[in-house]
């Protein structure tokens, strides 16, 4: 699920990724070498057209906050509203210009509510083993999941709640320090509760980095550190270089609400969403905490019910897109809801 530029910014679900040429199809290419087919969020009865976008026209869902719903929809869920009745009522107006405007407004409200609902759900794929006793309950282990707007695989870095003793750490702008888990296990118990396990790292500056630092364990974390340290002057570097300090071992665990979403490279994210601020940061040789430019999953789902575990991604998306849209997943992904 992403924001995409379409006169104004709108929310949609990528349902197919198409290479621009045959060479791209046979290689690991950057995002700008693909077209992205997107189903606009709203409701199926609105029959919103699908669109095709390039990577430069999209932003991660968690980079923008979802605007509040109009008063008429406050306190209601996407699934509880009779969207067909609302569409029928608006089409009874004899002024077609008013009808078009009213349906556009209704579609916008539906998209906001649908986005929060999808954000507050998850669905798992690629089961790895049979149920096993673990901490007193049976659990299944998985290779990945759709976590709200995002796809997360094992070994991906995910922003998480720091341990209590480090949770008050903040940068000079008042933003919380960034804690990241390298996800080694994705677990769902018999009550469909979700858990992540893996080592947790905190982004800090210190004189020396140990071999257990996060940049030695993950290429994305290494790139974050490399760019930040490249901004340091020789004098600044003497007082400490950036590193991912290990806070917790691979046995560390976070429940669903303590996982905030994927970790995004600060410089690439900032360059995409605010090029002017990116240039200013490079010139000043200072880069804010990654939390400055991306929300948590909990923040973007505020006000909507927690839908929890869904059978598969298409079920989670439900009636929020036009009928007939199928999600084209890589062959490597096998969802729990498949028969």
Feature locations, PLM:
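Eukaryotic chromatin- and chromosome-associated nuclear factors
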Residues: 1-339
């Amino acid at each position: 699920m992403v924001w995409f530029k379409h006169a104004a910014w709108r929310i949609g679900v990528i349902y197919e990724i198409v290479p621009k040429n045959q060479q791209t199809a046979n290689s690991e290419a950057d995002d700008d070498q693909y077209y992205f087919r997107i189903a606009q969020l709203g409701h199926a009865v609105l029959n919103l057209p699908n669109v095709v976008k390039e990577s430069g026209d999209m932003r991660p869902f968690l980079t923008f906050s979802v605007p509040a719903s109009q008063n008429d929809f406050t306190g209601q869920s996407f699934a509880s509203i009779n969207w067909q009745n609302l569409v029928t009522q608006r089409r009874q107006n004899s002024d077609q210009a008013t009808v078009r405007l009213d349906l556009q407004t209704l579609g916008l409200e539906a998209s906001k509510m649908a986005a929060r609902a999808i954000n507050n759900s998850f669905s798992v794929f690629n089961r790895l083993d049979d149920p096993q006793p673990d901490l007193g309950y049976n659990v299944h282990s998985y290779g990945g999941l759709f976590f709200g707007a995002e796809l997360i695989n094992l070994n991906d870095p995910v922003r998480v709640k720091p341990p209590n003793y480090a949770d008050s750490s903040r940068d000079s702008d008042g933003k919380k320090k960034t804690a990241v888990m390298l996800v080694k296990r994705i677990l769902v118990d018999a009550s469909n509760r979700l858990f992540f396990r893996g080592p947790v790292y905190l982004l800090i500056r210190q004189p020396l980095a140990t071999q257990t630092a996060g940049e030695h364990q993950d290429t994305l974390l290494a790139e974050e550190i490399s760019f930040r340290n490249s901004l340091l002057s020789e004098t600044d570097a003497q007082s400490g270089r950036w590193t991912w300090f290990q806070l917790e071992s691979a046995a560390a665990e976070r429940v669903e609400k303590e996982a905030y979403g994927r970790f995004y490279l600060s410089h690439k994210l900032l360059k995409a969403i605010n090029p002017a601020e990116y240039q200013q940061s490079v010139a000043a040789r200072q880069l804010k905490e990654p939390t400055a430019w991306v929300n948590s999953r909990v923040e973007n789902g505020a006000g909507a019910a927690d839908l929890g575990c869904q059978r598969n991604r298409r079920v989670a998306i439900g009636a929020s897109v036009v009928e007939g849209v199928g999600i084209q997943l890589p062959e490597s992904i096998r969802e729990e809801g498949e028969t």
